[in-house]
Amino acid sequence: MSAKAKSKEILDKDVWAVDEKIGKVKEIEIDLDDWRVTQLEVELEKDVAESVLGAKKGGVRNMLVISALEKGTIRRTDKGLLLQIRKDQLHVYLKPVDAT
């Protein structure tokens, strides 16, 4: 049996890189051809945005490219979403949010 979650169970949940909180889930992007979650829009913590992206302000949102993560690298826990990657690896999986 597969694990399931409703969007409201994921939105605004904390996102952790190994043991450090890096932000909160703000949006979910789904590939409508095969109904897979491909990206999570994460509002990064101010210190994470500064250290990983060089941003000078808080509230920076970036897309976390789920499809680039290996299976089992991300999982849901009581704390939120846990990424089995270090904060210094985040730049590989983040891309700017497209303006709408």
Regions found by a protein language model. Give the residues of each.
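Peripheral interaction segments used for macromolecular assembly
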Residues: 1-100
